[in-house]
Regions:
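Selected transmembrane alpha-helices and immediately adjacent juxtamembrane segments
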Residues: 157, 165-168
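Membrane helix-loop-helix hairpins that form the core translocation module of multi-pass transporters
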Residues: 114, 118-126
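Beta-strand scaffold of nucleotide-dependent catalytic cores
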Residues: 121, 158, 214
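Active-site/binding-pocket entry motifs
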Residues: 126-127, 272
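A glycine-rich beta-to-alpha transition motif near the start of alpha/beta enzyme domains, typified by
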Residues: 1-115, 168-289
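Active-site glycine-rich loop that binds ribose-phosphate moieties when present
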Residues: 127-156
Length: 289
């Protein structure tokens, strides 16, 4: 494969390798994606986003986790996509529809001059039924504020789908005290979740929610957009948060608004870090050696 042009973006520290491929010429595979996202041998990122054309919307977001697996949706990543297509002149519209594997999402770009500073995404309505998450158990049953034991510790846990699965756990004390590296992998691969799950550890912090997140197929990340939405939904259902709240991650703060019509809106920044070219063959050789 020839050299690939790419750009590095992040949304509240959640970083992505972005590849513009409107001609549908770039062939990706899990091993190449993992090599590109490898922080020692590749560019380094939480995920890779290929921007392509869509027959149903303005663009399609082909999103992959850092391990090469395919994911349905990424709230931070889709904001970065909005910034990329606008600032590269691929669109002159500030209202966009982007197709994802979790459906079409509407973006509102908030600009200053020629630059996109923040993006609001209509993330759609959350789903609670186990069949929608997916989660083991009766298809119609919900899992909200239920006890979940791991390593002898019982958490109050809720399962929510924002187009991808999330397990939200309310914890006591400071977020820094949570052993995310130990608990995250076990919960991601818990037998209750046949397709694995993202995991959020939540501490109420005044009018805000402090969160650490373990992402499926990635590990602990600086932030998670769909996770922020799942956290506000779960915390609101538990009576420990308003339906609109700031969600604080290591990488920054996201605004989440769960409106009365059931839809969740996510607002946050998108930042272009740098652009470059990479040699897939050379990266693969270093990774295998």
């Amino acid at each position: 494969m020839d050299e690939l042009s790419f750009a590095k973006y992040h949304g509240t520290g959640n970083d992505f390798v972005m590849i513009e491929d409107l001609g549908d010429q770039v062939a990706l595979n899990p091993s190449l994606i993992a090599a590109v996202c490898h922080r020692g041998f590749g560019v380094g990122a939480d995920g890779l986003i290929r921007v392509t054309k869509s027959a149903e919307a303005d663009f399609f977001m082909d999103y992959h986790n850092a391990d090469g697996s395919t994911a349905e949706m990424c709230g931070n990543g889709i904001r970065c996509l909005g910034k990329l297509v606008y600032e590269r002149g691929l669109t002159h519209e500030t209202e966009l529809d982007v197709e994802t594997r979790a459906g079409i999402k509407h973006l509102s770009l908030h600009t200053r001059g020629d630059e996109v500073e923040t993006v609001t995404v209509d993330m759609g309505a959350p789903a609670f039924e186990k069949a929608s998450i997916p989660m083991m158990g009766p298809a119609w049953e919900k899992f909200l504020q239920q006890p979940l034991e791991i390593e002898g510790v019982t958490f109050k846990a809720s399962a929510v789908s924002m187009g991808n699965p999330h397990l939200v756990l309310v914890v006591e004390g400071e977020p820094v005290a949570v052993d995310v590296q130990r608990l995250g992998p076990q919960l991601e691969k818990h037998q209750l979740f046949p397709e694995r799950t993202n995991v959020e550890f939540v501490v109420p912090d005044g009018d805000a929610l402090a969160v650490r997140v373990w992402e499926r197929g990635i590990g602990e990340t600086m932030a998670c957009g769909t996770g922020a939405c799942a956290v506000v939904v779960a915390a609101s259902e538990a009576g420990i948060s308003a339906r609109r709240a700031d969600v604080r991650f290591h990488g920054g703060t996201l605004d989440v608004d769960w409106r009365s019509d059931g839809r969740v809106f996510l607002t946050g920044p998108a930042v272009r870090v740098f652009e470059g070219r990479l040699d897939p063959a050379s990266m693969g050789e270093r990774l295998e050696s």
